[in-house]
Design a protein with these regions (language model features):
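Terminal alpha-helical segments
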Residues: 1-120
Length: 120
């Protein structure tokens, strides 16, 4: 997928997530946020020449380099993506339960990633 394809797909999934309700759908929102992060993160990696269009990173922890070595313009987005990955582990894969802070954190991290994509 190209960076444009990733941005389009990430935006489509993000719009779908916004239709879900909290707290009822918090697991789907946290899990879906990782999918949005995957698309926006890969778009940024392609745009900044870190990965070719044929290469993809499923999650920040699967990158071949640390976030602090990525190009400066995309570091905040990848820090947000790493936080989404942690939230997914804590809430989807572990036994954490919903709390009101979760909703604002998920949306804030996704908005950080979207902003980086708009900035190019």
């Amino acid at each position: 997928m190209t960076s444009s394809d990733h941005i389009t797909e990430g935006g489509r999934i993000f719009a779908s997530l916004k239709k879900l309700a909290l707290p009822e759908d918090y697991l789907a929102i946290v899990d879906g946020a990782m999918i949005v992060g995957y698309h926006l993160g890969n778009a940024l990696l392609h745009i900044h020449g870190v990965l070719s269009d044929a290469e993809h990173a499923n999650r920040p922890s699967a990158l071949d380099q640390r976030i602090d070595t990525l190009p400066a313009p995309i570091r905040p987005a990848f820090e947000a993506f790493a936080e989404l990955e942690k939230l997914r582990f804590d809430y989807v894969r572990s036994a954490s339960t919903y709390n009101d802070r979760l909703a604002s954190v998920v949306w804030r991290h996704l908005e950080t990633m979207q902003h980086a994509c708009r900035a190019g």
